Amino acid sequence: MADTSPRTDVSTDDDTDHPDLGSEGALVNTAASDSSDRSKGKMDQKTLRRLAQNREAARKSRLRKKAYVQQLENSRLKLTQLEQELQRARQQGVFISGTGDQAHSTGGNGALAFDAEHSRWLEEKNKQMNELRSALNAHAGDSELRIIVDGVMAHYEELFRIKSNAAKNDVFHLLSGMWKTPAERCFLWLGGFRSSELLKLLANQLEPMTERQLMGINNLQQTSQQAEDALSQGMESLQQSLADTLSSGTLGSSSSGNVASYMGQMAMAMGKLGTLEGFIRQADNLRLQTLQQMIRVLTTRQSARALLAIHDYFSRLRALSSLWLARPRE
């Protein structure tokens, strides 16, 4: 019994020491667990951010892909439409009749309507010129001549109105001059005559003129020449710009990206071609204003003679065309 008591005490001391060690281990384990939880929390936040970024990137990628597919579809539709328009243009292109005595245009209803209106206009003008010639030969008074001259000028205004409407439908028909005879087309400038050249031709037809009239006609001729040069330079710039637009980009490739680029080039070129109508309108305004200024400088009788000389000049050009086309061919 005496031997067992000390062992019992020692055993009791050992038992009292273990709970303290267990508490310290529990604290260490708890701290480690908290650190692990925080690390996992940080990892989870990074993962969530990364996942959110991936989802956003995927969403943007889908949107870009959808937009690209839509762009390709639009380009395909535009290309198909353009091919159809080109096919119609080839089927309804401008041609010259086999007899060669008359220029015909099948460039659409607009061109045909203009040709018909111009023919009626020319027929009416011939009647006016016959009346004016008869009045001059009969030595009619200025009041009678003034009425006829004003009628001729109003008729010219009607021509430029007809041409303005025609330019909206088919500006190339006006520029090509297919509504004119071959000899007239040799002198064609922006769908009509050069005012400065007509004034040169009239110089010998209107004598005698006062010094003031000569100065007025010379100034008008120079002003017209300057305006014509400016319009001609504008046309040259437009042609160069069109050439640059159509020649840019990759040639010979039919990839989807190049189709979109091609359609973009065509859209730019179409926009530039739209300015052609403005050139025709400005050229016709210059022609009309030159005629009106000429009438103001000249007397009534001189104005009548000038209008008659212009008419006779173009009549001779048309007659020359007929003779040329009817010439013997070996």
UniProtKB/Swiss-Prot annotation:
Residues 72-86 are annotated as: Leucine-zipper. One of its GO terms (biological process) is response to xenobiotic stimulus. Residues 46-66 are annotated as: Basic motif. Residues 44-107 form the bZIP domain. The keyword DNA repair does not apply. Residues 1-48 are annotated as: Disordered. GO terms for molecular function: DNA binding; DNA-binding transcription factor activity; transcription cis-regulatory region binding. It comes from the Eukaryota. This is Transcription factor TGA2. It comes from Arabidopsis thaliana (Mouse-ear cress). The gene is TGA2.
